[in-house]
Amino acid sequence: MEKVGVLVVSYGAREVAMVDAFTRSQSYDVEVYVADKQRNPFNVKRAVKHVVIPDLNVEEICKFAEVNKDRIDFGIVGPEKPIIEGVRDLVEKRTGIPIICPKREYAIEASKVQQRLLFQEIVPEVNPRFKIFYPSDYKNIDETRKTVYSWLDELENKAVVKPDKPAAGKGVGV
């Protein structure tokens, strides 16, 4: 059976599922090299090498890939933070290991505003109604509040509010 080395950049359950699927392959002898946000017992048990990088720092992920580059055939990244910070660009440039995730310039999760504007341009039928509230457009917080509440009334309070920047799943209000 052909041996394949896979770098997995992990934050949580999604990447655990990837590690599980890779290590259960019946077609390949897969060895996983995991760069994890925290010590995940499942990943530790299945990884040939496991390293904890608490902030998923792109430079540290790249160093881990460099040390193991002769045994890694490709990598896959789930968490948005290292994608937004250009992990693919850096690892591919310095190691030659192909990485499955968007390049930094295509990391649409970096800005919800840019994401919505892009969707409006290419697939408007799947893009929900949205409005962007720029603080600089308002004289004070009261004017901002009044405008936001007016928009919410128009939507009958059926709305989702998101910050422009990534919030690791913690920034959404319904």
Walk through the language-model features, giving the residues of each.
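ATP-binding N-terminal substructure of ATP-dependent carboxylate-amine bond-forming enzymes
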Residues: 1-104
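Active-site nucleotide/adenylate-binding loops and adjacent lid/helix of ATP-dependent enzymes
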Residues: 8-10, 110-174
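Long, charge-dense
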Residues: 105-109
